[in-house]
Amino acid sequence: MRAAGPWRAASPAPCTRYLARCKPGFRPSSSFVVDLLVDSGDPGLEDVALTECLSPPSLSCSNSTLSLLSPLGHQSFPFGADDSEGEDEEALDEDARESESKVESLEGIEFQQRSSCEVESQDKQEKLVLLQHGSLTPWEMWFVGKEKEERGRLQQKFLEELNQQIEKRKEMEEREKRKIIAEVKHKEWVQKKNKQERKEREQKINKEMEEKEAKKREKEHLQEKAKEKYQEWLKKKKAEEYEKKKKEKEKEKQRQAELQEKKEIAEKKFKEWLENAKNKPRPAAKSYGYSSGKLTGFYSGNSYPEPTFYNPIPWKPIHMPPPKEAKSGPGKKSKRHAASQPLPSSSLAVHNAKSSLCLGALCRGQR
């Protein structure tokens, strides 16, 4: 059994085509009923069409649905010799209607809102027609009711599937919309981020340039300050050098004056001594020498004069008490022992002094 689309618009051409065949005494065949069911797009219209075909000719042929009687077109219902009429035509119409139903099923919700009022009024008309013309048998009425229930179930199932498809389509559209919004926001964020990074880089470069300029200015300031300090130090150093040289010159001048004064005093003293030396008596001859193998005395200005006094008591060394035995190590004992050795005798020292005097006198004589 093939069911037509639930929200299919009622086309007046097929309805008039089939209703034109509804004449007095016409018995609809199964194929005729199926075609009429397929062409009709609404259950209310099917009932009206069925009643119009089964009613006397005086009734008007309005748009109705015969889809509820589609099982009557089965082979088990022998309606007469008109079953083979228009089968080829029905096959072609079925293919066209199937392709149209696929396209028109997507527009069901919009058509539902527009045709809801019309369907209700047509249902009322169908009920009135069926009540006025009870041309169906009880079994047919029961079968029509069952088919109506089945059609309602199929319509509900189709509506649910259609709603699911619409929901899926809405979800896909919403997902695409969110995706587009996310892409736009991401692009805006990337642009904002790039702009911010570019701004930060520019600020960083400007800051580095400002720091370089500040360091350069500070360096130049320090160089100028150091130059000024150096000039001040150099000026001060030159002043100190000038003062130092001036003091050295004054000292040198003073030293030269002192030397000149000393020289003059020395020359004066020498002249005085020279004048006094002419009148000074000479000392007695106290030098001795050998002449022809004999010791004789003579005067020599290079010899030392004879001492006028000498100590008749010979020199004696100072008495040193013997050292006490120390309790310390042997190194300290040896030191004390070395320190306690007696000094050389005074006679030897006197002899050495005399010999040195004699040697000095001889050296002067040789000169």
From Swiss-Prot:
Residues 197-228 have a biased composition (Basic and acidic residues). Residues 77-105, 191-228, 310-349 are annotated as: Disordered. InterPro entries: CCDC34 (IPR045323), CCDC34/181 (IPR025259). This is Coiled-coil domain-containing protein 34. Keywords: Cell projection, Cilium, Coiled coil, Flagellum, Phosphoprotein. Residues 82-97 have a biased composition (Acidic residues). It comes from Mus musculus. Residues 87-108, 153-280 form a coiled coil. Involved in spermatogenesis. Has a probable role in anterograde intraflagellar transport which is essential for the formation of sperm flagella. It is found in: Cell projection, Cilium, Flagellum. Expressed in testis and sperm.
